[in-house]
């Protein structure tokens, strides 16, 4: 006999794990399915964020890799630093975060299926038949569910049976090295979130150094607005940039590579994704929750999960299908911010020269305090920064009148 669930969640990332956590907490019978055999596999998120999500999602200390105090933006020429005596944010341990969310789901009465990849869905009048394949044995297993959640990230594997059915996508790609360095080098960066802009350190994107537990650093590079046919070339470029940051910025050849991981983001401009169709609800990167400017995804993936759970819970309790409101509410809250970030992303990563990036960062460093910068980078609260932008254009005009480029 086929085992039945109220909800099957496909994908054990932050969005999928949070969905399972919330629905099991509400008393629903949930299966969380993850294609990898361990949450330490495919550990592809840099996971830097502010402190607020720890409280927002009630996350424990054990998922924190490191607290950070300072923000450094290194351009091709100069570095611009904002400092604090207190912690401003965290770098999460992505594997431990996913494990925690799954464990909480189990504690709430849910089930977790590891090492099984999604194969197909078959829509029925009273639910959905879902097929999974064991990654080791290739054996098929089938379940039935009232609702199916697509938390497969940018591949959107559950919502769309055919890639041609997906909306237009913008692609981004990144790679990250998890390295063990000397105590001396680690101590230089243990409190800093470092971003790199400009062609010396990045190409159509940005690079980064994030601290983790003692002597461990995350070093990576990402590129946006790429073509699918250029994926292999992009992977080689981001790999070279990452190794350049290690060699020329950290100035070390004496390090141990603990892990190398990467991934491809597929983002729908103006959030044109399908949020619900035929008993399938999409969450997280499957509805473009990753921010197009900074690439931050965890917080917004989990927020989308919380919002989706409100409508899933209502459907399971009353039978009412209000999922159009799920899409409408999410876009109402985030669309304008995301569109501003889309425009900013193209300007910063593609249009601006090194000199233009340098001039703008120097101006912001001189005029914006730490909280203003964090509000723009992590919360996309642009009001004060927009005032700075008007000031930028005044400065730009003065540069033009003097025959210089700003």
Predicted feature locations:
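FAD/FMN-dependent oxidoreductases across multiple families
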Residues: 120, 225-311, 316, 324
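Glycine-rich FAD pyrophosphate-binding loop
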Residues: 8, 24-43
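A conserved beta-strand/loop capping segment in the N-terminal third of enzymes
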Residues: 52-100
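N-terminal Rossmann-fold NAD(P) dinucleotide-binding loop
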Residues: 16-17
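Predominantly flavin-linked oxidoreductase catalytic cores and closely associated redox partners
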Residues: 12, 107-252
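Beta1/beta-strand and adjacent pyrophosphate-binding region of the FAD-binding site
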Residues: 2-13
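C-terminal helical "tail/cap" subdomain of flavin- and related membrane-associated enzymes
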Residues: 310-406
């Amino acid at each position: 006999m086929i085992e039945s669930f109220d909800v099957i969640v496909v994908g054990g990332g932050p969005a999928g794990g949070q969905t399972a956590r919330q629905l099991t907490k509400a008393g629903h019978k949930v299966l969380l399915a993850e294609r990898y055999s361990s949450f330490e596999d495919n550990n592809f998120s840099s996971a830097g964020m502010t402190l607020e999500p720890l409280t927002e999602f009630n996350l424990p200390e054990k998922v924190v890799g490191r607290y950070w105090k300072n923000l450094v933006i290194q351009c091709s020429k100069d570095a611009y630093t904002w400092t604090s005596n207190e912690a401003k944010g965290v770098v999460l341990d992505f594997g431990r975060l996913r494990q925690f969310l799954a464990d909480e789901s189990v504690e709430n009465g849910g089930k977790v299926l590891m090492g099984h990849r999604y194969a197909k869905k078959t829509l029925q009048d009273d639910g959905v038949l879902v097929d999974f394949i064991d990654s080791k044995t290739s054996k098929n297993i089938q379940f039935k569910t009232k609702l199916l959640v697509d938390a497969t990230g940018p591949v959107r594997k559950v919502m769309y049976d055919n890639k041609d059915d997906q909306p237009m996508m913008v692609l981004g790609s990144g790679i990250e090295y998890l390295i063990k360095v000397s105590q001396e080098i680690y101590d230089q960066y243990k409190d800093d979130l470092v971003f790199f802009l400009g062609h010396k350190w990045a190409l159509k994107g940005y690079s980064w150094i994030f601290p983790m537990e003692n002597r461990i650093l995350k070093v990576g590079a990402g590129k946006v607005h790429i073509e699918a046919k250029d994926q292999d070339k992009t992977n080689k470029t981001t790999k070279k940039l990452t190794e350049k940051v290690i060699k020329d910025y950290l100035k070390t050849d004496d390090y141990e590579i603990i892990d190398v991981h990467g991934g491809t983001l597929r983002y729908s401009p103006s959030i044109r994704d399908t949020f619900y169709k035929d008993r399938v609800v999409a969450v997280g990167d499957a509805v473009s929750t990753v921010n197009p400017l900074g690439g931050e995804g965890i917080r917004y993936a989990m927020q989308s999960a919380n919002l989706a759970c409100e409508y899933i819970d209502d459907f399971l309790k009353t039978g009412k299908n209000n999922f159009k409101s799920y899409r409408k509410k999410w876009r109402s809250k985030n669309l304008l911010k995301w569109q501003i970030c889309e425009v900013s992303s193209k300007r910063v990563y593609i249009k601006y020269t090194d000199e233009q990036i340098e001039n703008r960062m120097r101006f912001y460093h001189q005029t914006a305090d730490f909280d203003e910068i964090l509000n723009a980078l992590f919360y996309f609260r642009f009001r004060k920064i927009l005032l700075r932008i008007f000031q930028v254009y005044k400065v730009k005009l003065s540069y033009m009148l003097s025959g210089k480029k700003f």
